[in-house]
Amino acid sequence: MANELKKYILSAHIVLMVLLFSACNGKSKTSFMQEGGDTLNLRYAENLQIVKYQHYTQVTLRNPWDTLKTLHTYLLVNKQDSCPSSLPEGTIVRVPLSNSLIFSSVHCGLLQELGALDKIKGVCDLQYIRVPAILESCRKKEITDAGSSMNPDIEKVIDMHPDGILLSPYENSGGYGRIEKLNIPILECADYMETSALGRAEWVRFYGLLFGKEAEADSLFAGVEEAYLSLRNQVKDITPKPTVITELKTGGTWYVPGGNSTMAKLYADAGARYIFADIPQSGSASLAFETVFDKGCLLYTSPSPRDRQKS
């Protein structure tokens, strides 16, 4: 039974990681209401809304830490078109992006799946990236290594002239420092704060719009959805449900996904019982090593030894 569950959990991980993998110069416009838009039907993503209008697409990100507020609004305008004179409030992004800076290894993998690796011109945290084509392009200096995502090399960022920066936002981060002053659209990828694996995966439709890969993104998500739901159905009646923990100890602290997180939902859908499912949050929680160790469990998932060695 344990081996069978490991297989299903691994399969679910693979399905998830397939994905998880300006002006006009990016300036904001004054606010007013628009009518007549076509809202995309998003079945799982709770923090994402996409509305298509004749001359632009409005993407609204709900603040996952305060769901009554908006995290960010983007107005996607095709590069081939003139920028409309009247737009609602939001950050204008000229699409498709062709010279992007990617902070997260997850989104590097995602762009590989979308066939958009040629749109990446810079990355951060190169030590965590496992995409051979990106590593080779960095070696050849075709892709810029901009250093740490926590403190990117601002001179390198300026030199590469990115048309968009994809990064993961954090609660109470205090902003993005000097990079915010470069007048480059910052795309806040809050997909990891969704409360289901399919909710996070559905953000691929947003990324498809950013990189001119809408059809590819829709097809990719449809395949992932079908595979995921099939796996979930295969294990829904398994009893007893084996216990599982995840992640690694960092220093004296063990960071674990909250009970409302994508990973917690993934384990539940895979037929397992996540031992910290009662932690009421979507992000990670910091626990003492002894607290985790004393729980005991049947299954344990973590980054590979190679990833751990290079992290």
Which role fits each region the language model picked out?
Residues 65-158, 167-169:
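A short, structured surface patch at a secondary-structure boundary
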Residues 258-259, 263-283:
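Alpha-helical, coiled-coil/dimerization segments enriched in small aliphatic residues
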Residues 116, 182-183, 270:
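Short, structured coil segments at secondary-structure junctions
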Residues 142, 153, 159-166, 172-253, ...:
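Extracytoplasmic substrate-binding proteins
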Residues 24-108, 216-244:
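Bacterial Sec-exported substrate-binding components of ABC uptake systems
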Residues 300-305, 309:
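Conserved small/polar residues in nucleotide/adenosyl-binding loops
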Residues 151-161, 287-296:
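Short helices/loops that flank or line small-molecule/ion binding pockets
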Residues 1-30:
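Bacterial Sec-dependent N-terminal signal peptides
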